[in-house]
Amino acid sequence: MAAAGAMPGGLLLTFLLLAVVASGAYNSAGEPPVSRRSFPKGFIFGTASSSYQYEGGAAEGGRGPSIWDTFTHQHPEKIADRSNGDVASDSYHLYKEDVRLMKDMGMDAYRFSISWTRILPNGSLRGGVNKEGIKYYNNLINELLSKGVQPFITLFHWDSPQALEDKYNGFLSPNIINDFKDYAEICFKEFGDRVKNWITFNEPWTFCSNGYATGLFAPGRCSPWEKGNCSVGDSGREPYTACHHQLLAHAETVRLYKAKYQALQKGKIGITLVSHWFVPFSRSKSNNDAAKRAIDFMFGWFMDPLIRGDYPLSMRGLVGNRLPQFTKEQSKLVKGAFDFIGLNYYTANYADNLPPSNGLNNSYTTDSRANLTGVRNGIPIGPQAASPWLYVYPQGFRDLLLYVKENYGNPTVYITENGVDEFNNKTLPLQEALKDDARIEYYHKHLLSLLSAIRDGANVKGYFAWSLLDNFEWSNGYTVRFGINFVDYNDGRKRYPKNSAHWFKKFLLK
């Protein structure tokens, strides 16, 4: 289907040229064909993004600073190319073009996050509401709806307000629960008449483990003996404290939405979790147990409270009094606090049992007593992508979904991220940089794995590819590219469809 509105001439030419290239570029011989028509009726396909990685306009439109602004500017050495998200993919200015790209591919939905500090520059109601920020997101939502694309909104994708970090250490304080709830309520009031799917938090595991255990992500806290070279932190306590407060903020926000807005707005609300799949390093009971502990410490950390009202038994046993406890009231509040679960899957690891530590230097990174690796006996679990942590293992996608089905009562699931990156090779001519056949293979095989899980009863209702565009990839900066559309960082952030964009367009034909 043609995109509404005129496409820039260069972009149109690229589409026409690549339509020829893409038609035969990826040889899927040996793999069953897959398309939209393979999936259940009403299944949603979309792409995903996040505010700090995409928007830019960091100092425009009344936006206040987030912890990622501070982290990238004060610690450029922690970013591979010393870059930041000041401009990012410039979706703050180019959002209409982004929506045209989605529409042209035939995408049903777009998952994006709201920048908390674009709504509340100082993080709380006391600092005032930024009307320019409200206007920007209204414009984006209305543009999406005018092109037939459903908005799925994430309220928090790691860019918490620096003002709240300064005031009470952000998510280390229970004070953030009410401030987050106030922020969420503004979004429900302003956008909820048109937005029918809400996600409170994106990947609390990543935020808490990288932000408070290793110090590799904002706010850059860790114990002094960790490799993150942090000036402050406690890797054995703070990750658990921060994520405890995220779970409580999530649950309070869900209660608010269900009590005041859901009946009128008729939307749904959930949370996005991430998990790798874990394969025992060898066929031993100790390594089987290590794989189970690994998934408990990454996924069960959040899923167990949401389903059962408490943390996994393995975490309670190994972390002890460093793991916060839920009161009876909190347990009841968190349990069942979702309409759906967003699930992000990228990769798998082998899990190898570790003996108990000496009790010194406690850290989330070693509490699970599982050594995680992508390589066994010199052989990787799957092809390695540009990011050193990302090994391609489609089978794990199916295994994870069936694990969720069998262990957590088969909740409604949306795959809110799935994707792969390549290196940003600045020497490649544009036409070569658009040939991302490895990404097409990744999507083809993962969609087949997803389809297999659905046929075996997994209750999955939608799939969002990560990502619509190349973008600022956190500590990797702009050294890797996850987009199905190429962003030219040297020429006004122009967008060019990669082969995978054409593949998706063909896949999504109705």
Curated annotation (Swiss-Prot):
What's a Pfam family in this record?
Answer: Glyco_hydro_1
Q: Which GO terms describe its cellular component?
A: extracellular region
Q: Does the keyword RNA-binding apply?
A: no
Disulfide bridge map: C208-C243, C222-C230
The protein's enzyme class: hydrolase
Q: Which reaction does this chain catalyze?
A: Hydrolysis of terminal, non-reducing beta-D-glucosyl residues with release of beta-D-glucose
Source superkingdom: Eukaryota
Residues at the catalytic site: E203, E417
Keywords, alphabetical: Disulfide bond, Glycoprotein, Glycosidase, Hydrolase, Secreted, Signal
Cellular location(s) = Secreted
Q: Which GO terms describe its molecular function?
A: beta-D-fucosidase activity; beta-galactosidase activity; beta-gentiobiose beta-glucosidase activity; beta-L-arabinosidase activity; glucan exo-1,3-beta-glucosidase activity
Where is carbohydrate linked to this protein? N122, N229, N361, N371, N425
GO term, biological process aspect, one: carbohydrate metabolic process
User: Does Secreted appear among the keywords?
Assistant: yes
What residue range is the signal peptide? 1-24
Instruction: Sum up the protein's function in the record's words.
Output: Hydrolyzes p-nitrophenyl beta-D-glucoside, p-nitrophenyl beta-D-galactoside, p-nitrophenyl beta-D-xyloside, p-nitrophenyl beta-D-fucoside, p-nitrophenyl beta-L-arabinoside, cello-oligosaccharides and laminaribiose.
What name does this protein carry?
Beta-glucosidase 12
Please name the taxonomic classification of the source.
Answer: Eukaryota, Viridiplantae, Streptophyta, Embryophyta, Tracheophyta
Query: Its gene?
Result: BGLU12
